[in-house]
């Protein structure tokens, strides 16, 4: 293609959306590398310590959209210390100094401050989209800066963040000239909401397609918001624990009947059962339903709601739905592609007889032939059930099974679940993400290494017998990018068997395993392009006291590839070898 002008090649590159494919294109020749450098507008960085912002900007000076991840995935399970790192401020400072035309920023598991948000809002004149997922460190003062200064804002999406509500009036900071908003999600905010300011904002946003409210927005306000935004496609409702008065209910019904375009519904943080019938008219068009926080919707009310959603492709639900409820899903939702079943009692404090089991999983797999992604928290499982699921749904690309009790065997035969998970990886040739649990031996990892050729991310908890289990995975899964292990018997022999393997991976996490400080030191000596972090939260003992005892087991090991060396913001309890 050397005879094509650069402009033509650049136009061809515009049709290549995959970050992985764009990376491959840039390696073909110097000419393509240069063209890709100046034409790349979107960049994804899965680890904020793999590169620094200055190097990123030199590589892609025309950057407009940046996705950045901070803490490891196990931070979602409270396994990463609170102040470990993942600070976004150095990135925003560098981007501001470089004067790149940043328009979109997506952050996940990062520390974001009000100062960072204020700098972001003042540095990029055409900034349009901010998405924060599982972030912490900021308040509504920072959101007020974004609202006041980002005059072209189209998207403000706040998901699962820890936000201090210093000022409930942040919505009032959107100027009257702000009419560009297309997506607004503040469901994770716990404080009061300026309903009047919200109504004015929604009324002057004709292109608003997605609106997700927090629990402070009352039912009568919801009706008014829906009346002035009938174009919504995605709606997240708040908390309605009191029975509605007839007038409010009638207004809500009138507004909902106009919603012919709505395709996604979520929320219901608390809800009175009599409120639900108002939403029945829109259920027939829904393709996405998220009830993962709707603990109050149970029994016949939940079943009735599900039975009306015949076109669902995506369902997030609590395990209180029970196996009978999942059977209704299987009989009703023939287009279902993604299912997530979350635990309603995460601490195990209740005798939850409604929890789902292998019966519900088999029913779903038999009734939903298009299913390709599942997250399933359950109290028990059998090999026979997993074998049936593998036969019914061979198109899984994500299969995450979390049995709530560690080391729990097949509850009928009392055998390990090796054969069941083995059937999954054998049948599902396109499997890219897998989480395993229950009683598992090294045999299951032999199966994974042999058959999971496309696997990119594997999560292991309380599993395995010896170092062989981890070696089977590392030797067999050539496309593995992220491997995370907790409370398993893998040690130095597995860690050090093929150090070069980690050069092709994004990261390795091991906590409460058999790895020692000496093993980590040897790994670091042989891997100059890897950061080897030892995390010891027990500051009373002090890391210095144990650092010379190479037989000392490490609490947590986080290993990741980097091109910029050791990070400078590690807290005292993190030692980088």
Curated annotation (Swiss-Prot):
SMART domains: FBOX. It is found in: Nucleus. The keyword Nucleus applies. Its main location: nucleus. One of its GO terms (cellular component) is SCF ubiquitin ligase complex. Pathway: Protein modification; protein ubiquitination. CDD domains: F-box_AtTIR1-like (cd22159). One of its GO terms (molecular function) is inositol hexakisphosphate binding. SUPFAM superfamilies: RNI-like. Ubiquitous, with higher levels in flowers. 1D-myo-inositol hexakisphosphate binds at residues 69, 108-109, 340, 398-400, 433, 481-482, 506. The keyword RNA-binding does not apply. Residues 1-45 form the F-box domain. Residues 76-77, 343-348, 402-406, 461-462 are annotated as: Interaction with auxin-responsive proteins. InterPro entries: COI1_F-box (IPR041567), F-box_dom (IPR001810), Leu-rich_rpt (IPR001611), LRR_dom_sf (IPR032675), Transp_inhibit (IPR041101). One of its GO terms (biological process) is protein ubiquitination. Keywords: Auxin signaling pathway, Developmental protein, Nucleus, Plant defense, Ubl conjugation pathway. Induction: Repressed by miR393a (microRNA) in response to flg-22 (flagellin-derived peptide 22). The record marks 134, 160, 377, 486 as: Interaction with auxin-responsive proteins. Part of a SCF (SKP1-cullin-F-box) protein ligase complex. Interacts with CUL1 and SKP1A/ASK1. Interacts with Aux/IAA proteins (IAA7 and IAA12) in an auxin-dependent manner. The F-box is necessary for the interaction with SKP1. Confers sensitivity to the virulent bacterial pathogen P.syringae. Component of SCF(ASK-cullin-F-box) E3 ubiquitin ligase complexes, which may mediate the ubiquitination and subsequent proteasomal degradation of target proteins. Auxin receptor that mediates Aux/IAA proteins proteasomal degradation and auxin-regulated transcription. Involved in embryogenesis regulation by auxin. This is Protein AUXIN SIGNALING F-BOX 3.
């Amino acid at each position: 293609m050397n005879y094509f002008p650069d402009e033509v090649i650049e136009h061809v590159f515009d049709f290549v959306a995959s970050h992985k494919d764009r990376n491959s294109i840039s390696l073909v020749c110097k000419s393509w590398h240069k063209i890709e450098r100046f034409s790349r507008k979107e960049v994804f960085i899965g680890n904020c310590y793999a590169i620094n912002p200055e190097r990123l900007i030199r590589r892609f000076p025309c950057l407009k959209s940046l996705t950045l991840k901070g803490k490891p995935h196990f931070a979602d399970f409270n396994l990463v210390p609170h102040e470990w790192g993942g600070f976004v401020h150095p990135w925003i400072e560098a981007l501001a100094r470089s004067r790149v035309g940043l328009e979109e920023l997506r952050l996940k598991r990062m520390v974001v401050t009000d100062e960072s948000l204020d700098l972001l809002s003042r540095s990029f004149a055409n900034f349009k989209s901010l998405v924060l997922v599982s972030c912490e460190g900021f308040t509504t003062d920072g959101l007020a800066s974004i609202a006041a200064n980002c005059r072209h804002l189209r998207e403000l999406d706040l998901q699962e963040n820890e936000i201090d509500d210093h000022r409930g009036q942040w919505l009032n900071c959107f100027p009257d000239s702000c009419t560009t908003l297309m997506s607004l999600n503040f469901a994770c905010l716990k404080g009061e909401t300026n309903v009047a300011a919200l109504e004015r904002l929604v009324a002057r946003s004709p292109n608003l397609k997605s609106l997700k409210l927090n629990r402070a927005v009352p039912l009568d306000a919801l009706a008014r918001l829906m009346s002035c935004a009938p174009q919504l496609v995605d709606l997240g409702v708040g908390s309605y624990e009191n029975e509605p008065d007839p007038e409010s209910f009638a207004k809500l019904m009138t507004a909902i009947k106009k919603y012919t375009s709505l395709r996604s519904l979520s929320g219901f943080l608390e809800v009175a059962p009599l409120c639900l019938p108002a939403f029945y008219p829109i259920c027939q068009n829904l393709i996405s339903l998220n009830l993962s926080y709707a603990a109050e919707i149970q029994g016949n009310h939940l079943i009735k709601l599900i039975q009306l959603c015949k076109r669902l492709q995506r369902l997030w639900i609590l395990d209180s739905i029970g196996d009978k409820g999942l059977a209704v899903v299987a009989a009703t939702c023939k287009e279902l592609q993604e299912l997530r079943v979350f635990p309603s009692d995460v601490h195990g404090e209740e005798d939850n007889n409604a929890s789902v089991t292998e019966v519900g999983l088999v029913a779903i797999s038999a009734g939903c032939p298009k299913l390709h992604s599942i997250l399933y928290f359950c109290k028990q499982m059998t090999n026979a059930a997993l074998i049936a699921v593998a036969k019914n749904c061979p198109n899984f690309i994500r299969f995450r099974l979390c049995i709530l009790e560690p080391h729990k065997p097949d509850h009928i035969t009392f055998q390990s679940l090796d054969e069941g998970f083995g059937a999954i990886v054998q049948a599902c040739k396109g499997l890219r993400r897998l989480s395993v649990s229950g009683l598992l031996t090294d045999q299951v990892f032999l199966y994974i290494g042999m058959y999971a050729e496309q696997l990119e991310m594997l999560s292991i908890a309380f599993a395995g017998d010896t170092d062989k289990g981890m070696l089977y995975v590392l030797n067999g899964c050539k496309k593995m990018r992220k491997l995370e292990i907790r409370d398993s018997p893998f040690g130095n022999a597995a860690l050090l068997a093929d150090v070069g393997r980690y050069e092709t991976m994004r990261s390795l996490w091991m906590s409460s395993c058999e790895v020692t400080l000496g093993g980590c030191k040897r790994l670091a000596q042989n891997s100059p392009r890897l950061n080897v972090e030892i995390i010891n939260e027990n500051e009373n003992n002090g890391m210095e006291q144990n650092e010379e005892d190479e037989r000392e087991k490490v609490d947590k090991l986080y290993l990741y590839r980097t091109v910029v060396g050791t990070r400078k913001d590690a807290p005292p309890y993190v030692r980088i070898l």
